[in-house]
Amino acid sequence: MGKKLSNLDYLRIKKNIIKRLYSNKAFSKGHLLYERLTSGIPPHLAGFVNHVLDDLIKEGLVIHYGRTKYGDAYQLNVQKLKEIEEIIS
């Protein structure tokens, strides 16, 4: 059986993903590849990024931009900018 993700680690990964997208200005015109999102997360938590990213998409904070020739790309939902800025601060 696999390791479970604690609530604190879940929030850390969530904040890290949103911060990275926000700092790279990945809004309506920009996007960020999956590999770039996972690069700042510790190796023992890297397996949980997909789970957290799926939850962010369900919440509507992150949008799946599409597949590029380099991999999956993601961007922030501009309509939920206030919620995103609350999470970051």
Task: Set out the residue ranges of the language-model regions.
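A short, conserved structural fragment
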Residues: 57-67
